[in-house]
Design a protein with these regions (language model features):
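Short loop-to-alpha-helix "cap/lid" segments that border enzyme active sites
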Residues: 1-142
């Protein structure tokens, strides 16, 4: 029905790296079984799950890291499509936005619940996670 809709799948932390590995492997297989590979992007706070997703997902599948401590260069070396960090991380490291773009990577900021913050990252971040989509559209469309 909504064949152009992107699906963002977050893999949560698990109690052990082995459980994360198993979850990542099963999730990638499920996405393939449902023939959603071209629509799914993965996000995770876990560096272990990140590596397992990158290893198991089809080459070119967008995988983003959420935790905030890795530099764009580190993420690029792992094979990430970009970073997906809280806006406070990018306020501390504003140079990471340009670095990501120079490396051909995308930038997402989360979770923005304030129009001033939306304006701060408008035109700099590629994506914005928010609970206020109508307000975000007003900022972007100005």
């Amino acid at each position: 029905k909504h064949t152009t809709l992107k699906l963002i799948l977050e893999l949560k932390h698990h109690s052990t790296p082995e459980r994360e590995d198993l979850a990542a492997e099963k999730i990638v297989k499920m996405v393939e079984r449902m023939k959603l590979q071209n629509r799914v992007e993965y996000i995770t706070f876990s560096a272990n799950a990140l590596r397992t997703l990158l290893k198991n997902a089809p080459k070119g599948t967008p995988v983003y890291y959420l935790n905030g401590e890795m530099t764009p260069s580190q993420l690029k070396e792992l094979g990430c499509a970009g970073l997906d960090y809280h806006y406070d991380v990018l306020r501390k490291h504003p140079e990471w936005i340009d670095e990501c773009h120079r490396l051909g990577m995308k930038v997402n900021v989360w979770t923005v619940r304030n129009t001033d913050v939306m304006r701060e990252f408008d035109g700099r971040a590629d994506f914005l996670t928010t609970d206020l989509p109508a307000e975000a559209l007003k900022v972007v469309n100005k």
